[in-house]
Amino acid sequence: MQQYSSKYNKQAILLANLGTPDNYDTKSIKRYLKEFLSDPRVIEANPVLWKIILNLIILPIRAKKNVHTYKTVWNKQHNKSPLLFYTENLADKLDKKLDNYIVDYAMRYGNPSIESKIKNLQDQGATEIIIFPLYPQYSATTTATVYDEVYRVLSKLRWQPTIKGINPYYDNKFHIQTISQQIKEHLKKLDSTPDTVLFSFHGLPKEYFDKGDPYYCHCHKTYRLVKEELQNEYPNIDFELSFQSRFGPKKWLEPYTTVKLEEFAKQNKSVVVIAPGFSADCLETLEELAISEKENFIKKGGKEFSLIPCLNDSNQHVDMLYNIINEEICLKK
């Protein structure tokens, strides 16, 4: 990140993403999962009972199991997870585009932490920090916990910076246009028109929605708006929505991505999948969708499977974030 004089640069933008292990070894994965799955926003359960289950059953099993999956998607050239690599590059590009702002990034879980980056920004002279959670759709399990951590950090500071936040952008025109254009460009590269474009969002326990989490509604709004942008141009393509990454025995938001893909496979359909809830490619897209779901889809009789990459560190993503920020806070020139 660029270094700025505190005398002239007092506003900063902090991009926040979910997080990642430092490496793909068991110890690193276990440490990351423990922090992530210990967040009461993520797992709503009896804290004493959950702590026992987490430490004695889940962490030993999942940490070891995930070594192979993380190793499969790891960016070995830069020794970083894809999520970290793309988020870092995204922040760098946005930093270059915003001359009058310090732009940095942090992870809610793992490194670099929100606490360390707030300190770094203050050291550079930032007296106002604009928090930008890179989750288009709001959920207490993602967006809210970013702000929980921000205010936990602030509660320990004697000199607190002013904090502002960028709203969830699930229905923002710049987001909808960018996702729509991304799908169009991908479809142009294909040899034939697919039968279906499936919008796969990360899942959520249904009881969270029943308690008032708006995530389900936000996902459907994104899906509907993008569909409206595309359906006239592609009348022969079905656009559908599903939820992936179910964890545990509870009922999650439906329909499940696995179930929908198996239905399409039995009908020998060709499918294009996009995961518009993820700002950067990660385990859930590069392994779960691109490998596991694809293999199962083909095995069950599916014709063709194509995954659209996340926006990652693309110029389109940088421009989209710039426009959203400018729309919300009227960037100083």
From Swiss-Prot:
GO cellular component: cytoplasm
Pfam families: Ferrochelatase
Annotated metabolic or biological route of this protein: Porphyrin-containing compound metabolism; protoheme biosynthesis; protoheme from protoporphyrin-IX: step 1/1
Catalytic activity entry: heme b + 2 H(+) = protoporphyrin IX + Fe(2+)
Listed GO biological process terms: heme biosynthetic process
InterPro entries in the cross-refs: Ferrochelatase, Ferrochelatase_AS, Ferrochelatase_C, Ferrochelatase_N
Residues binding Fe cation: H202, E284
GO molecular function: ferrochelatase activity; metal ion binding
Function summary: Catalyzes the ferrous insertion into protoporphyrin IX.
Family: Belongs to the ferrochelatase family.
PANTHER family: FERROCHELATASE, FERROCHELATASE, MITOCHONDRIAL
HAMAP family reported in the protein's UniProt record: Ferrochelatase
Record protein name field: Ferrochelatase
Species this chain originates from: Francisella tularensis subsp. novicida (strain U112)
Organism lineage string: Bacteria, Pseudomonadati, Pseudomonadota, Gammaproteobacteria, Thiotrichales
